[in-house]
Amino acid sequence: MFKKKAKEEKPSPVPDAQQNGELPNSGPIIYYIYESEEEEEEEEEEPPPEPPRPVNDKPHKFKDHYLKKPKFCDVCARMIVLNNKFGLRCKNCKTNIHHHCQSYVEFQKCFGKIPPGFRRAYSSPLYSNQQNACVKELMPFSASNRTDPVFDTLRVGVIMANKERKKGQDDKKNPMLEEEPEELPPKPEEKQEGDVPDGDKKGEKGGQDAKNKKAQPGFMQSHYFVALYRFKALEKDDLDFQAGERITVIDDSNEEWWRGKVGEKAGYFPANFIIRVRAAERVYKVTRSFVGNREIGQITLKKDQIVVQKGDEVNGYIKVSTGRKVGLFPLDFLQEI
């Protein structure tokens, strides 16, 4: 009759949430500390500034060129024979080089085109129309045979203007030889006396000749002259000579045209075609073309040019002069004449 009621389970009280989301009786409070790590930027050292690269404002314009005739490289002075005689030639200055030598002339300035009126041979720079002409000794050879009519006209005009001057100089006696006729008149008086023996007469003549030679104004024997270029006579009274010949100067009163003698031949020639050589100096002929570096005092010369030694050998180079410029040149490319 009597039934037992099931015990009602009392709902357990939910604990109140505390601040900061902490549960009661959950143990000691744990605090978390977050440290912000600041990345320290390492100061990178700036690299040293690069040196300014030299800029060539007048570079060569090289193009592949087939060399029909044997040519020497203007850098290494060796013949261009590889790759079926193909090389590089500058469009402006006509410089010939190997393909593997192009890096050596990267910073060398181009001389530019040669005026067509001055395409003349290095052996006769004023009046020759041959190939391989040069305006200046620093300029490379040209590969053209063309001439300028203006240049030819000026050349003829110079020749005509010099004719009267040469004739006038021929009429006048050479001042170097004027002393001899002044001393000749006393000879008849000596013959009239008849008291001087033959031996004494010969002695007096020899003494007079020695005096004339000593008193004769002119060039000293401490030096002589050598032809730099080949000069072809244009007139009958011109002196024809080859490059490297020794010339005896007779008259140098004119600045442009001198009178000289080679062997038994005598005549006029341009004064800038010869160079004075001292007794202790040597004369050389260039056997190979060479492009020198001006920054270290080297000189650029072409084959068959005539130069004069001006210094001793240093590390295979000697100081030479062409009359217009002086510089260092390899001794192996020179032949003494």
Curated annotation (Swiss-Prot):
SH3 domain ranges (all copies): 220-279, 280-337
Compartment(s) of residence: Cytoplasm; Cell membrane, Sarcolemma; Cell membrane, Sarcolemma, T-tubule
Biased composition annotated in UniProt, kind: Acidic residues: 35-48
Region ranges (Disordered): 1-61, 162-215
Gene3D superfamilies attached to this UniProt entry: 3.30.60.20, SH3 Domains
Gene expressing this chain: stac3
Bias kind Basic and acidic residues: ranges: 1-11, 167-176, 184-212
Cross-referenced InterPro entries: C1-like_sf, PE/DAG-bd, SH3-like_dom_sf, SH3_domain, STAC1/2/3
Gene Ontology biological-process annotations: neuromuscular synaptic transmission; positive regulation of protein localization to plasma membrane; positive regulation of voltage-gated calcium channel activity; skeletal muscle contraction
GO CC list: cytoplasmic side of plasma membrane; cytosol; synapse; T-tubule; voltage-gated calcium channel complex
Zn finger limits (Phorbol-ester/DAG-type): 59-110
Membrane-topology descriptor: Peripheral membrane protein
Species annotation: Xenopus tropicalis (Western clawed frog)
PANTHER family the UniProt entry points to: SH3 AND CYSTEINE-RICH DOMAIN-CONTAINING PROTEIN 3, STAC
CDD domains: C1_Stac3, SH3_Stac_2
Cystine crosslinks: none
GO function term, MF aspect, one: zinc ion binding
Assembly mode: Component of a calcium channel complex with CACNA1S.
Protein name: SH3 and cysteine-rich domain-containing protein 3
Role: Required for normal excitation-contraction coupling in skeletal muscle and for normal muscle contraction in response to membrane depolarization. Required for normal Ca(2+) release from the sarcplasmic reticulum, which ultimately leads to muscle contraction. Probably functions via its effects on muscle calcium channels. Increases CACNA1S channel activity, in addition to its role in enhancing the expression of CACNA1S at the cell membrane. Has a redundant role in promoting the expression of the calcium channel CACNA1S at the cell membrane.
Protein keywords: Cell membrane, Cytoplasm, Membrane, Metal-binding, Repeat, SH3 domain, Zinc, Zinc-finger
SMART domains: C1 (SM00109), SH3 (SM00326)
